């Protein structure tokens, strides 16, 4: 690189650059990228000023030959390239003669025509990013900034580029040539990456048009453009006294910092109203499986074949009837839909060869349940933009719901162990790198604790259903395809098992955008009598479809078998996330790992083995009205997993908001517990932000009641 610099640049520039580096105690032989950067910058500054003069009338002119006419004055004063003392002398004399405000940092040029200092930048990164860094550093609206990049882009304050097109094109061409020359010698990559700040690139959106005008109009007082507001915000030093910072921000803001004491916080106000209802895409604790062990039938693994085989294991079918109607729906249609499924499955069996997929006949009951032809007709915006009172539908506020005990039971069930294993050891993927012994040991211990957990069953069920539904939505867009809800597991003895939970019928699915909705009807087996908690099943129509013989301690008993039917919907983006529910395993494993790391750093050795094998030790799991609940390490793993799984199953904007806002209050309370004497302002506003997310979502309401328990115990 050093040789390249000496060949490529004018000897005067090279000499100036060496002098500048030595002034800062840097060695051009060692810091060759910096050497090249300084030379490039010097050359751009000289090219910026070359050939630009001011004539006797004070007009700016370009003269390319050395005209003997001495009445011309150079348009630009070059400050860059002088030693510091001399440079400041020049700046001071300019300020004294022109009355321009003295800059805090040495600029590169002074423009006698526009009467302003100019900071010239040459960057190997995005011009905006470098522009903002410069603006941040100099924090002066008086100094004009002009940035060039090696790719031919440029950016200048208020898009005022000072020079004519041709002069700027010369500079860009020269920079491009330098880049090509470096690249041909294999020097460019190292040079490009060596620019400070490469790691912290933030993609900046280019804002144009209306949004740009709106942005410029909606700035706080005293800012002339979005750019200088951004620069100000980016340069805001966050540490230090809050009151001082606030007064620095605006004259109008005066925040009184209130001390946060044990008596300060109040519990979150939970909404009143009827109890909340189940809103998951499939049944959780209430699901019932029809299963086959060691499946070896013809077509094993083809969902439809597996489903028919599972259906044949049950002999207690009976004439279905409605035991809990859906308040708003046409219940006979749900009944007819189930009868249609049974009839069409029977038809399949009567065929010579069972097909791989089954499309249902488009009967009136299915059209109704799947909302066929219900969507309002779409009108092209061009045709209606002149309608004077065009507005969005008025939608009702969601009805507020109170917490219900069923969601706590659902969560408790999700933490329990089942008698089957739902994942193989390698389900939490192998690391690509040669992974350390410790990491694989942790993974194996963790997998052993959660492989039989019901939350893991929900993961595999969710992955299966979402994958099948997304596939069908893309492959059979117009068809009402019948999709069996299936999962696979291993029994204690290691035998494979295939389970059928029920069926889904998918509606039309022309999904262009990520958020376009596909409707489906789900029909799921259960032994839960819906009349015990009717509020939980508000969105369902429940049929009684058979009697099941169950083995109990007192012998065989017959229990009615129910079918939970409802209309539901999902979108491409939701199905994509549903397919990736295995990530929940990874998230909870990482949480456990951080607990192990904390232990290990205290003991100064790896505690993985002790952590999992010391069965006598208990760990905090969570807060309940009784106080801090504790349990074995396995219970902690399963609880963390269940939380992660429920965050996925019950994902919603309410949950997003609640998690983000309640976390702030949590941090304040924890600071109080750690005797850090926290202070707050506008605590009421924070409570408002949290409570506006408490509307009707069962999982959010449960988290809020846990939060209240935490507050009670934390502040005792």
Swiss-Prot record:
Pfam families in the cross-refs: Flu_PA
Motif Nuclear localization signal 2 (NLS2) per record, residues: 184-247
InterPro entries linked to this entry: INFV_PA, PA/PA-X, PA/PA-X_sf
Catalytic EC class: hydrolase
Named cofactor requirement(s): Mn(2+)
Keyword Transferase: no
Ranges spanned by the short sequence motif Nuclear localization signal 1 (NLS1), renumbered to the chain: 124-139
List of residues binding Mn(2+) 2: 80, 108
UniProt xrefs under Gene3D superfamilies: Influenza RNA-dependent RNA polymerase subunit PA, endonuclease domain
Co-factor binding details: Binds 2 manganese ions per subunit.
GO CC terms, sorted: host cell cytoplasm; host cell nucleus
Keywords in alphabetical order: Cap snatching, Endonuclease, Eukaryotic host gene expression shutoff by virus, Eukaryotic host transcription shutoff by virus, Host cytoplasm, Host gene expression shutoff by virus, Host nucleus, Host-virus interaction, Hydrolase, Inhibition of host RNA polymerase II by virus, Manganese, Metal-binding, Nuclease, Phosphoprotein
Post-translational modification summary for this protein: Phosphorylated on serines and threonines by host kinases, including human casein kinase II.
Keyword DNA damage tagged: no
Annotated family: Belongs to the influenza viruses PA family.
Protein function: Plays an essential role in viral RNA transcription and replication by forming the heterotrimeric polymerase complex together with PB1 and PB2 subunits. The complex transcribes viral mRNAs by using a unique mechanism called cap-snatching. It consists in the hijacking and cleavage of host capped pre-mRNAs. These short capped RNAs are then used as primers for viral mRNAs. The PB2 subunit is responsible for the binding of the 5' cap of cellular pre-mRNAs which are subsequently cleaved after 10-13 nucleotides by the PA subunit that carries the endonuclease activity.
Assembly information from the UniProt record: Influenza RNA polymerase is composed of three subunits: PB1, PB2 and PA. Interacts (via C-terminus) with PB1 (via N-terminus).
Descriptive protein name: Polymerase acidic protein
Organism, as annotated: Influenza A virus (strain A/Chicken/Brescia/1902 H7N7)
Gene giving rise to this polypeptide: PA
